[in-house]
């Protein structure tokens, strides 16, 4: 409620002051101003838009999108953009009021919601879906296509360039997908169990043949208890799994509890490394790109489990 009230006040202020841009009125040499919520979306937008777009990402390294709340500065960035790109599927759960109001006033798109519903993983008993779609490269390509469509709509004079850039980016992603499958083939099938702090890797598991278990649910906003820890400990002991993984955007406390629980049962489990789940690495590093993040995760998982 508080977040929604703040958004309403800010939007009213921007409406009175005329803040905002008109992408349709841009000249050929002007850049499209794009604001993306997550770094995964921002990376795709930069690759597709090339020199014709300027992309601002709200969430940086180590930021949890499930818990993220838009600041006044974020709202200004959203309102001053020509195009707003966000994931949707309730990933940005604390920002839904803000994003809904943005959509009433300017061009915006929930890029993950471009994926056909029959390809999504249902979440619980409701009508919601697992939002962590970027861990399936074939599914993430639907989001890439949606970004290209939004850019072409905003700047039709550069549609050919956006189409060409998107084609090249998708070819890179398809190569990354093939490489990932080749690397994972080195892990024995019985060892393909991926245990992490929260349930962010279900699409990854479906795509690459892993049994995936997270201590918390789909959102880090959900809690976990002693029973959840014990169930994971029992699984690790039964399957003789030797490694679990921490996440860059989630506290290590929960996974450390699992490691200690296994130790008490006489089974040694190590921390296999840190995976990038809801956020990518620092901008300017390999892990700060979608490809670099994905390669890091594959290399870390393969090294720990093979």
Swiss-Prot record:
UniProt xrefs under PROSITE patterns: PROKAR_LIPOPROTEIN
Organism: Bacillus subtilis (strain 168)
Effect of inactivating the gene: Null mutant is very sensitive to manganese.
Signal peptide feature range: 1-18
GO MF entry, a single one: metal ion binding
Binding positions (Mn(2+)): 66, 132, 198, 278
Lipidation (N-palmitoyl cysteine): 19
Pfam family, one: ZnuA
Subunit organization: The complex is probably composed of two ATP-binding proteins (MntB), two transmembrane proteins (MntC and MntD) and a solute-binding protein (MntA). Interacts with FloT.
Family, per entry: Belongs to the bacterial solute-binding protein 9 family.
Keywords attached to this entry: Cell membrane, Lipoprotein, Manganese, Membrane, Metal-binding, Palmitate, Signal, Transport
Summary of the function given for this chain in its UniProt record: Probably part of ATP-binding cassette (ABC) transport system MntABCD involved in manganese import. Binds manganese and delivers it to the membrane permease for translocation into the cytoplasm.
Protein name in the entry: Manganese-binding lipoprotein MntA
Disulfide bond listed as a keyword: no
GO CC terms of this entry: membrane raft; plasma membrane
Taxonomic placement: Bacteria, Bacillati, Bacillota, Bacilli, Bacillales
Induction record: Repressed by MntR in the presence of manganese.
Lipidation, S-diacylglycerol cysteine type: 19
Any one Gene Ontology BP term: cell adhesion
Location of this chain's protein in the cell: Cell membrane; Membrane raft
UniProt membrane topology term: Lipid-anchor
Cysteines paired by S-S bonds: none
